[in-house]
Amino acid sequence: YGCCGWAPDDAWLHSAGASLWVDGAHISTISEERLTREKYDGNFPDLSIDYVLDEAEITRDEVDLVVYVESIHSTPRHDAIETVLSREFPDAKISFCDHHQAHACATFYTSPFEKASILSFDGAGNSFPNNTYETGLYAIGDKQKGIYVVYHSINGAKEHSTFNLGQAYNNISRWCYSKMEPKKAATIINPYIFMETAPGKIMGLSAYGNKDKVDLPDLFKINNDKFYFPYIYDHRMPTEPQMDKYDPKDIAAWLQDQFETILVKFFSTITIKAPNLCLGGGCGLNVLANAAIIKAGLFKDIHIFPAANDSGLCFGGAIYEVSQKEKKMAMPECLGFLGKSYSDEEIENALQ
């Protein structure tokens, strides 16, 4: 099984990579950026594919199944991707896996839990022709029965605009960064790649601020077991003039507190829940929020896949198919090191 991430001529795609599995066993996974040295490289992962195939000493002609993380619903881009992948892997079946399904599979199946609640959430997932896109997924995972999706959030339709904490964090992080580093913000070449990096910086900045200095309405609401960021509909998103009254570090502290508070409230009130929790998606890398969930004592244990952001999609997409087709899966022993091993001699030669 192979999985790669990329889309033709799409500047909004990033973090391409490839993951190879053989007979239910993980062989190797790598991000294209590790080989091209271009941060968040979203081009077709030629080097990643060659890297993982070389480890198993097989060719592209020998790959049986290729999984691509993209909406399972057909779109013009979907068809273009399938055409290219069929050309690159002539004897392989081409399959698709939804963005947040891939995140969910990556974090749940690498966890030690037989059953767990799963939350995957980030800025955005798959986009659809009607200008809507995924923002999150809440599910219950069972290693014997699979993953049961409780809520799958589609942003842009009011009744489904839930789990979009990542969008809020991205938007306000962008404002904070533009105030702290105006020259850098003005020269951003790819705004989406910028959005990948800004939230982590603002999470760090929050430690220097004071949330109590900010007097703004709460960002999020909870309704029927779902949290959402309703600024699109009732203008709860603070305007720039409103935020301009405050120091960016205080806005960062307020934003982080809002983020943590709504997560703890959600897990406190959710009616469908398992004893343990798995987090995926870029928001799963918010260590302060994760600590707040742990401190609240709402779960026995929590697991976060190290590559919770989109660099782990190729890994999760492959697991999506492997979990359905193989009776047993052999996970890598160390989730922080998914590439191939190197001998002492190879390391010495590289250093020389």
Short names for language-model regions:
Residues Y1-Q352:
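Short acidic/glycine-rich loops and adjacent helix/strand connectors
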